[in-house]
């Protein structure tokens, strides 16, 4: 079994020119697979059948592997067995048609209205706080991705008509409205922006005058959340998810939210309908006299 694996590593390294990191990941997964096979007294790849592949997955799950890691292990095994088929050592790939356990759908976390109010209730006049408040207000008001906000220039924003021009995924441009609170916060920021000695046309700059980095935004939001007494970790995703959830709760217009978020597929936006249903179910449970549903 090891001889075939060594030929496979050479194939990946020389012919496929895969990175050492990727090869190491494959090695880790297949080494673990061989250990499971050895426990079943399987010492030849020709002994591996579809039932054996399913056993490998079941045993790996029993050992504590999560869904994502199980999918990686199956993928590594399937690719290797496909190589053996190409080499004529196997007639068919026994892993073909076998799926790893589906990854559970993790609903994004969001803040409720009171938490948003708590987050933004800060009127500090420090220039860096004025900048951060503008970032927070704009992200929550428009649902921008972190990369979209970080890439904004001065000419991207129009506080008079309250619109921001965004370059999203796939280099697609869209225009997103924002509210009067965000507009006011941005105007306040523009009054003090020159104090940071900006070196380019970036809307949001660091204290060194450069375009603020992704990491700096993440750290500032985390710090702001702690300072405002939020119990949960604050990050750009949470602001975007909160925007989407609150928009759906207020309007139920999935297509409009899709456009605002810049999703190319409606299915991506539909995850927020699950969040919205959770909110409605909670209201129902609290309000209806016969609503005590079993959980």
UniProtKB/Swiss-Prot annotation:
User: Taking every annotated instance into account, which residue ranges of this chain make up the domain Tyr recombinase?
Assistant: 106-285
Record domain Core-binding (CB): where: 1-85
The UniProt entry, under SUPFAM superfamilies, shows:
DNA breaking-rejoining enzymes (SSF56349), lambda integrase-like, N-terminal domain (SSF47823)
Q: Where in the cell is it found?
A: Cytoplasm
Mention one GO biological process in which this protein takes part, according to its record. Answer: DNA recombination
Query: What are the catalytic residues?
Result: 145, 169, 237, 240, 263, 272
Cite the Gene3D superfamilies for this sequence: 1.10.150.130, Intergrase catalytic core
Named from the GO MF annotations, one term is: DNA binding
The record's disulfide annotation reads: none
- Principal cellular location given in the protein's record: cytoplasm
One Pfam family, short name please? Phage_integrase
The organism's place on the tree of life at top rank: Bacteria
Name the family the entry cites.
Belongs to the 'phage' integrase family. XerC subfamily.
Describe the subunit structure. Answer: Forms a cyclic heterotetrameric complex composed of two molecules of XerC and two molecules of XerD.
Name this polypeptide is given = Tyrosine recombinase XerC
Organism in which the protein naturally occurs: Haemophilus influenzae (strain ATCC 51907 / DSM 11121 / KW20 / Rd)
Which gene does this sequence derive from?
xerC
């Amino acid at each position: 079994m090891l001889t075939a694996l060594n030929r496979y590593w050479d194939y990946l390294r020389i012919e496929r020119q895969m990175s050492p990191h990727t090869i190491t990941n494959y090695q880790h997964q297949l080494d673990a697979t061989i250990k499971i096979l050895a426990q079943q007294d399987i010492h030849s790849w020709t002994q591996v059948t579809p039932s054996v592949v399913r056993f490998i997955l079941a045993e790996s799950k029993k050992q504590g592997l999560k869904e994502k890691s199980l999918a990686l292990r199956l993928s590594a095994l399937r690719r290797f067995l496909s190589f053996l088929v190409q080499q004529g050592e196997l007639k068919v790939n026994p892993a073909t048609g076998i799926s790893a356990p589906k990854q559970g759908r993790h609903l994004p976390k969001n803040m409720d209205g009171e938490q948003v109010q708590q987050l933004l209730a800060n009127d500090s006049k420090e220039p860096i706080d004025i900048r951060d408040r503008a970032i927070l207000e704009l992200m929550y008001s428009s649902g921008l991705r972190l990369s979209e906000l970080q890439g904004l220039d001065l000419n991207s924003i129009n506080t008079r008509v309250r619109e921001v021009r965004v370059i999203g995924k796939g280099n697609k441009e869209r225009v997103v409205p924002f509210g009067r609170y965000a507009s006011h916060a941005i105007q306040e920021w523009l009054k003090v922006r020159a104090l940071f000695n900006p070196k380019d046309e970036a809307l949001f700059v660091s204290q060194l005058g450069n375009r603020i980095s992704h990491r700096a935004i993440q750290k500032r939001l985390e710090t702001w959340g702690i300072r405002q007494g939020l119990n949960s970790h604050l990050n750009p995703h949470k602001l975007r998810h909160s925007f989407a959830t609150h928009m759906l709760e207020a309007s139920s217009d999935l297509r409009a939210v899709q456009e605002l978020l810049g999703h190319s597929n409606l299915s991506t936006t539909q995850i927020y309908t699950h969040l919205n249903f959770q909110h409605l179910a909670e209201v129902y449970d609290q309000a209806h006299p016969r609503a005590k549903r079993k959980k």
